[in-house]
């Protein structure tokens, strides 16, 4: 359960940072 959420967060966070900072 937890590892799946952790992987999801690890996958989503970089895209959020990319969208906010425009650094991709």
From Swiss-Prot:
Disulfide bond annotation, renumbered to this chain: 18-24
- Major place of residence: secreted
InterPro entries from the UniProt entry: Antimicrobial_frog_1
Q: Does the keyword Disulfide bond apply?
A: yes
Pfam families (alphabetical): Antimicrobial_1 (PF08018)
GO biological process: one example? defense response to bacterium
Q: Tissue expression, per UniProt?
A: Expressed by the skin glands.
Q: Which domain of life is it from?
A: Eukaryota
| Keyword terms of this UniProt record | Amphibian defense peptide, Antibiotic, Antimicrobial, Disulfide bond, Secreted
Subcellular location as annotated:
Secreted
User: What are the annotated GO cellular component locations?
Assistant: extracellular region
According to its UniProt entry, the function of this protein is described as: Antimicrobial peptide.
Q: Which family does it belong to?
A: Belongs to the frog skin active peptide (FSAP) family. Brevinin subfamily.
Query: What's this protein's name?
Result: Brevinin-1R
Q: Which organism is it from?
A: Pelophylax ridibundus
The opening ranks of the lineage are: Eukaryota, Metazoa, Chordata, Craniata, Vertebrata
């Amino acid at each position: 359960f937890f590892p799946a959420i952790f992987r999801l967060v690890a996958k989503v966070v970089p895209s959020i940072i990319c969208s906010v900072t425009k650094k991709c």
